[in-house]
Amino acid sequence: IEITSTGFNPATLEVKLGDTVTFVNKDNQAHWPASAMHPTHTVYPGSDIEKCGTADDNNIFDSCKGIRQSEEYKFTFNEKGSWGYHDHLAAGLRGKIIVN
């Protein structure tokens, strides 16, 4: 999924259980992809912004920091469902991952 100043492309992505999704920042500003809802990031099971900086931060749908231009954030989806996400640094930018 590419991240630009106008949002995520594609904004909605359908994947299979166990697939890894890569977010790539194509903007010159930092972006912070994370599970909905802003500001807690708790919609995806087990995710919570409060887990950033802990031993659990590699297991949550949260980059836990702004990623710079050309940097990537990867997350493997191990829960079926429709998972909203957003940019923590620009909360109006939103998308959805559908895991089948």
Question: Where would I find each of the regions flagged by the language model?
Answer:
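Extracytoplasmic copper-binding redox domains, predominantly the cupredoxin/blue-copper superfamily
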Residues: 1-100
